[in-house]
Amino acid sequence: MTDFKLLEKLCTVEGISGDEGSVREIIINEIKPFADEIKTDNLGNIIVFKKGKNRAKAKLMLSAHMDEVGFMVTDITSDGYLKFDEVGGLDRRVVLGKTVTVGKNKVNGVIGVKPIHLSKSDERTAVPKYGEMYVSYTHLTLRTNSLG
């Protein structure tokens, strides 16, 4: 039987690169009943040991990423927009107009760029850099370096 609740939990928990603690906690809690030993190293990797029935057989290693790409708030403009930079490798061509959830208080926003009627002709066809994009949000409860 497939555990869709676990899959949903792992897919919806925040785990931006450098802040994977929530993902790590879920994984450890899920594998505890099956493990003989669980350790985390200085990089946050989970190392699990399970004794086999036959020591002569081959060893098995499972490896997977816990982190996900995201953004970090770098500035709040005087008119209240959030400036941000990428955390991980995100293609700038696909983020405009996307909804985002920012910070521990889960503030909702939308990624935007200077309106077309205020843009120069070369800006209208170029892919904007992250420094030219902003997040428009519903209310402010954020600080610089918030992850989201």
Specify the residue positions occupied by each region the protein language model found.
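N-terminal hydrophobic/helix-forming segments and targeting peptides
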Residues: 1-140, 146
